[in-house]
Swiss-Prot record:
Protein name from the UniProt record: Small ribosomal subunit protein uS8
Pfam families according to UniProt: Ribosomal_S8 (PF00410)
GO cellular component: a single term: ribonucleoprotein complex
Function: One of the primary rRNA binding proteins, it binds directly to 16S rRNA central domain where it helps coordinate assembly of the platform of the 30S subunit.
Any one biological process term the GO annotation gives: translation
Family to which the UniProt record says this protein belongs: Belongs to the universal ribosomal protein uS8 family.
Keywords associated with the record: Ribonucleoprotein, Ribosomal protein, RNA-binding, rRNA-binding
Subunit structure: Part of the 30S ribosomal subunit. Contacts proteins S5 and S12.
Length: 132
């Protein structure tokens, strides 16, 4: 089966694993998925990310994070720019997710950045997803 939107699949797998409180999630690797996972780790939404190399495409292992009482750290993930409808943001119109409580993941000429980093570097790009 050919997957038309591997980023949406990745976000859905994280959302589903988070809903049933799995500790670890494994997905097929790609550069953009690695970048998204690293941003989630850097921003404190997941505990850790491991990239396991094999002879094929590799695997990304994401360790999900929960609060003291088992509450989810990731409330939701939403795919914004889709293959059928791309969404771009200029450097002056960078989106804010829940007034700064969440993050927007932006694909820029300088790589994958959060909305805050894109504002600091004064670059625009494709709005990949919102995480809060």
């Amino acid at each position: 089966m050919v997957m038309t939107d591997p980023i949406a699949d990745f976000l859905t797998r994280i959302r589903n694993a988070n809903q049933v409180k799995h500790e670890v999630l494994e997905v097929p690797a790609s550069n953009i998925k690695k970048g998204i996972a690293e941003i989630l780790k850097r921003e404190g939404f997941v505990k850790n990310v491991e990239v396991i190399e094999d002879d094929k495409q590799g695997i990304i292992r994401v360790f999900l994070k929960y609060g003291k009482n088992g509450e989810r750290v990731i409330t939701n993930l939403k795919r914004i720019s889709k293959p059928g409808l791309r969404v771009y943001a200029k450097r002056d119109d960078m989106p804010k997710v829940l007034n700064g409580l969440g993050i927007a993941i932006i694909s820029t000429s300088e790589g994958l950045l959060t909305d805050k980093e894109a504002r600091q570097k004064n670059v625009g790009g494709e709005v990949i997803a919102y995480v809060w």
